[in-house]
Amino acid sequence: KKRHYIFADQLPPASEDLLFIEDYRSTMVTAKGKTISFRPLLPSDEFAYRNFFYSLKEKTIYYRYFYNIKLFTHEMLQEQWASIDYRSNISLIGLSQEKGHKEIMAIGSYAKESERVAEVAFMVREDYQNLGIASHLIAQLEVIARQNGYEQFSAAVLIDNRAMLRVFTKRYANATFTEDGHEIRVVMPFEKNLTLETIQPASA
């Protein structure tokens, strides 16, 4: 805060949180040879997160929020940040080395819907789409969700967002899809016979 890397109204995670979220780090190498590192979103990521948002095309934002957002304000991010506890609600970011520094190029989140169900959502920068990044994120989020008592994911997806529907279909063979106007509600029960080691995304 003294160096203004985070705002005065941002509170850092408690020390016990910082200890266990270290286990939530992972990496992957894309088919194009790019190394992506994944970790939980932190308050100090605000500027990078906002830069990520403004780097996205309108269609990508619309697919995520179902309406167009022109401004991504400090207050909007604080509202999102206030719900993150790294257990019932969490956001993971993917970072890639760009022009000498790391940039956020993806974010995946889950939020509590009920005691056993968490709603999941993703955004991936256009030049990093179709590289398996959302699939890696959902695998990592499932590991964390299982550790915190969840038994399934849900998602609301626009009917023409075929790429996201493919990600869910590929991972969850027993997923159910319910069409409601322009949206599809997806329910994705976790397979009960899998171990955490089986579903853990690859790490370097």
Predicted regions and their residues:
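Long, contiguous binding/interaction regions
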Residues: 1-204
